[in-house]
Amino acid sequence: TRLAFGTYNRPFAPNRTGADWISASTANVDAYLADPLCGGDPTTGLFREMLWGIWFITYPGNLRRMDPDVPVLFLSGEEDPVGENGKGVRRAAHALRRAGVHSITLKLYPGMRHEILNEDDRDIVYRDLLCWLRHRLPSQEA
């Protein structure tokens, strides 16, 4: 676990816990650490699937097979080390643009880390997601 995720906490030193990178909310970090279903050691299967997924999305031919008219939404915390503080998320969006995808929306949330849906300001994220969906899904008027 340290080999794969060990550097994520460094930007938040001095660290209160080993999972400070998860959220800016100490209550959320504490809930994560107290949850027996969270924070376990990742399996080799997880790493196999993750590495396969990374390979798949970085192979340009696979991205070009995507329907260019399907809208894509990227949401990330601006302080999420998994997304390289937005740099990795921007690269992913740029790769899709290069592959011909027309409708890409990217939103980075200042002060938020990895679990943007559990941060103190999560209502902003949910509102943005709902707004994005409403603008792209057909109306269900009766």
Label each PLM-derived region with a short phrase.
Residues 1-37:
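Alpha/beta-hydrolase-fold enzymes
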Residues 31, 49-52, 91, 124, ...:
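Alpha-helical elements of Rossmann-like donor-binding domains used by nucleotide-donor carbohydrate transfer enzymes
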Residues 43-64:
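Active-site nucleophile elbow and catalytic-triad environment of alpha/beta-hydrolase enzymes
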Residues 57, 99-142:
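Catalytic active-site module of serine/aspartate enzymes centered on a nucleophile-bearing elbow/loop
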Residues 63-68, 99-101:
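Short, conserved loop/helix-junction motifs that constitute active-site signature segments
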Residues 74-76:
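Short beta-strand/loop motif that positions the catalytic acidic residue
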Residues 78-81, 112-113:
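Acidic beta-to-alpha connecting loop that harbors the catalytic carboxylate
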Residues 81-91:
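Conserved alpha/beta-hydrolase "acid-adjacent" motif
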